[in-house]
């Protein structure tokens, strides 16, 4: 009984911080994420583009792992989707995938790492 009440309290608090205007994020999507960066007194938005290779859903703790290739080196970054540091998320392109996690892309290079694009 006590566990049910505490879960309701947790859900009520979390619901205040969940972003409502998020696009539907799927594995294999190419996304552009705007991250707020504070440098001294200035605040700016830095964009990060890449492919979603993993997604973990847990209400407010939802994370996505985004991978991109920069100067021949693979870079992966994990983003908390509902974080106040995330300014915007835009889906640039969707791809057809048959896996829940695309970790196999880590071993592929060049054209082999391309995903088949889907059109809406």
Curated annotation (Swiss-Prot):
Q: Where in the cell is it found?
A: Plastid, Chloroplast
Recall the GO molecular function terms of this protein's record: structural constituent of ribosome
Is Ribonucleoprotein among this UniProt entry's keywords?
A: yes
One term under GO cellular component: mitochondrial large ribosomal subunit
Keyword Ribosomal protein in record: yes
Q: Which Pfam families match?
A: Ribosomal_L19
Q: What is its main location?
A: plastid
Q: Member of which family?
A: Belongs to the bacterial ribosomal protein bL19 family.
- According to UniProt, the name of this protein is Large ribosomal subunit protein bL19c
Organism lineage reads as: Eukaryota, Sar, Stramenopiles, Ochrophyta, Bacillariophyta
The gene from which this protein is expressed is: rpl19
């Amino acid at each position: 009984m006590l566990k049910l009440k505490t879960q309701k309290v947790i859900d009520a608090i979390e619901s205040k911080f969940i972003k409502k205007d998020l696009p539907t994020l799927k594995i294999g999507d190419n996304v552009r994420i705007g991250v707020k960066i504070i440098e001294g007194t200035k605040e700016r938005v830095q964009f990060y583009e890449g492919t979603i290779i993993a997604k973990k859903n847990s209400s407010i703790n939802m994370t996505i792992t985004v991978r991109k290739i920069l100067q021949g080196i693979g870079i992966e970054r994990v983003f908390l989707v509902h974080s106040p540091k995330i300014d915007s998320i835009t889906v640039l392109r969707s791809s057809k995938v048959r896996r829940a996690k695309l970790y196999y892309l880590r071993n592929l290079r060049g054209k082999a790492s391309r995903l088949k694009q889907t059109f809406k």
